[in-house]
């Protein structure tokens, strides 16, 4: 398959691209970053907020698009409106941060969303994809850990475990959360 990965040279993207390459897919990576691209991929350098950069994708045909870097609905609109529309599936990495604080588990697509969340653009993107009838799958992972993680929160947690330090739990101590490994997230997305 011909695959476009938006943001494929860091953490989740790096794990995903590695697994896709193991399945012998033809991969284009669109990134603004300075990380080197993996062998056997085509790096397309550009800022997804810049229409001139997005035009580099204009005449390319993809079977699947993995969007790891999208944060705002305008970014997704710009991308999709400038792509050949023959792709079969748009796979979007959202966030569990779109949900309101909720003590009823498990969460589902119908669970209340936090319209003031810093992840508001993620659920606005999902709503736009539904409205436009674009074939998509959205993943809403929680805290992701694993090789290449650049977020301090998850590393802080494991550092405390490794050094046998206590891990403070907010409120009355009954709060639960779940961490997911980057490799598991990549597997389920494929």
Set out the residue ranges of the language-model regions.
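Alpha-helical substrate-binding/gating segment
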Residues: 158-168, 175-190
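Glycine-rich "substrate-gating" loop/helix at the edge of Rossmann-like oxidoreductase active sites
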Residues: 142-151, 171-180
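Short amphipathic alpha-helix with an adjacent loop that forms part of the alpha/beta core around
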Residues: 51-61
